[in-house]
Amino acid sequence: MFVVSEMADFIKAGGLGDVAAALPRALRHRYDVRVLIPGYRAVLARAGKVEIVGRVLAHAALPACDIGRIVQSDGLPIYILLSKELFERDGSPYVSTSGSEFEDNAIRFATLSHAAAQIAAGRAGLGWRPRLLHLNDWPCALAAAYVRWSGGTTPCLLTIHNLAYQGLVPYSMAAALGIPAERVSELEFYGQMSFLRGGIVHADHVNTVSVSYAQQITGPAQGCGLDRLLAGRAAKGALSGIVNGIDASWDPRTDEYLDSHFSVNHWQGRQANAAQVRKAFGLRESTGPLFAVVSRLVHQKGLDLICEVAPQIVAAGGQIAVIGGGEPEIEQQVAELTRRYPGQVGAFIGFEEGLARRMFAGADFLLMPSRFEPCGLSQMYAQRFGCLPIAHATGGLIDTVDDGVTGFLFQQASAEALRRCLERAFRTFRLPSLLSAMRRAAMLRPSGWDVAGKKYISLYERTAATAPAVATVS
């Protein structure tokens, strides 16, 4: 059972939602995969008629909840954890419409985790038990602990999509969350409790969304205070990485958001898309390179570095189109660039799916100087559409961008390193045959979920074989 706090079919706050929509479907040819997700207002609005099929009992301060069931049009079964009190509210899965975290997030997601453990134990009245729990990020991580604390043996795989988010709560909430007093130390994190730490301790296997990120989080620079614990899991062969895939709908030959389609053998549509992007962002007609930024406008994504090198890009004849939202200070810096370089730098503060896809389909290069990146999806979307990533060599960017072949990598997260990498990109742009060869290589790079799915099948079997009571995944 795939346990998740967001799913793009219903509600999405980040890349996890895309993974939750794609990976279970990629595995259905092999397993009876079912998804468990909270019954947010947005989920219920899109679910249609929900059949009540089970119930989980209250535990400490965690309320009893009904379990609803729907079946997607492609046959994927979805279990929905129903609670008006906890989940039926406006906002994203984690924050209110004002942008502040819900104060009861610990109760909300402990309830989700406990429900998963109860389903695994066959105590929810479903008439079905999963042979493995696949848990995703801190909102679901505590399920592995609940399983073990109750004496359960269901194999648990925990996937870390971003280690920076750990689900930190005060010790004073231990009793309310149903955490045994003698077990609190297993969640200890610098004077607080961490849901994610509990999952790392108790899951049979932990994986991340890229091979390089799995290696990097075992060191202090990117371990977010959990590096020693993760290094210990790695030493026992219980930490690995699998690069995410991207959905098959990202196809420049058929994408519904594109007016002009193209392929590796017929490039003409890219020029038409570039013209559309320039018009949408108020950029002048140009024969120079077009650089896209499709990102949250936050420090982690290196947007301050882009703002620092923007004058050099413009001076060299390039143009920049930015879409995204985030930290007010960086939004203001981007707005200032558009005022300083009218017709050369344009921005859309917010997000619009169709516009983002047209940017990938029309821009020559994608700027992605992330300081850390567990996997990253934008670089793979860009490659699929023949837009070459210019990326900092970290995490999943190392695993997905072949320097000088399917994009460009720079080693240090600094403006100077980015400038030197941009010089390489400009030289490539002036060599049409090399540019075309790199675009072709990028578009042909295997990045579908079929590749990642096969690796998850192997990981499921390995996780089941090393669990306390050996189980066969089915």
UniProtKB/Swiss-Prot annotation:
GO terms for biological process: glycogen biosynthetic process. Pathway: Glycan biosynthesis; glycogen biosynthesis. Keywords: Glycogen biosynthesis, Glycosyltransferase, Transferase. Its EC number is 2.4.1.21. GO terms for molecular function: alpha-1,4-glucan glucosyltransferase (ADP-glucose donor) activity; alpha-1,4-glucan glucosyltransferase (UDP-glucose donor) activity. Coiled coil: none annotated. It catalyses: [(1->4)-alpha-D-glucosyl](n) + ADP-alpha-D-glucose = [(1->4)-alpha-D-glucosyl](n+1) + ADP + H(+). Gene3D superfamilies: Glycogen Phosphorylase B. CDD domains: GT5_Glycogen_synthase_DULL1-like. InterPro entries: Glyco_trans_1, GS/SS, Starch_synth_cat_dom. The keyword Secreted does not apply. Synthesizes alpha-1,4-glucan chains using ADP-glucose. Belongs to the glycosyltransferase 1 family. Bacterial/plant glycogen synthase subfamily. PANTHER family: GLYCOGEN SYNTHASE, GRANULE-BOUND STARCH SYNTHASE 1, CHLOROPLASTIC/AMYLOPLASTIC. This is Glycogen synthase. It comes from Xanthomonas campestris pv. campestris (strain ATCC 33913 / DSM 3586 / NCPPB 528 / LMG 568 / P 25). The lineage of its organism: Bacteria, Pseudomonadati, Pseudomonadota, Gammaproteobacteria, Lysobacterales.
